[in-house]
Amino acid sequence: MTEVKENSLIVELRTFAKLIGEEGRQAEFYRQMLKDAKPIEVVRLSEVFTDTEIKAIKKFVKPKVNECYRNATLFSHIYPEVKYVEGKMTCCGAFGIEHAWNKVGDKYVDITMELVLDRDPTKEEYMALGEYDQETVVSICSEVGFYGSVYPILYNKQKSEK
């Protein structure tokens, strides 16, 4: 029987949560992230889109290095059914980095990894913290004036409403 390996990003998150301890705002945030953390698998763009559609994505989004939040946001504007996802991914199969990618139907794709870095996203581990529609992302970006940080911003809003 094949042993299923636990997602290393969730293990990493759990480890940091233990280091932080049980008290304080940071501990609360880590507990919430652990509740929301969802291991996912990303597929190649070619499993979801045609070559013509991939060329159109490159042309209209113009994805850039070190701008995954921008890339994922703009991609979600092109196709209304595409969701924006924030979470973490492994970097070269090692440590976790904060990252944004997209969900198309029931499949996850990462245009930054494929179209900018020319890397195979299926070789990395991913952990989603939140999936958002275009309206939510636009609202947050307009409010704060930059791309990204949707998950922590919404977390803080929910905490302040309580």
Where are these predicted regions, by residue range?
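A structural boundary/capping signal
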Residues: 1-162
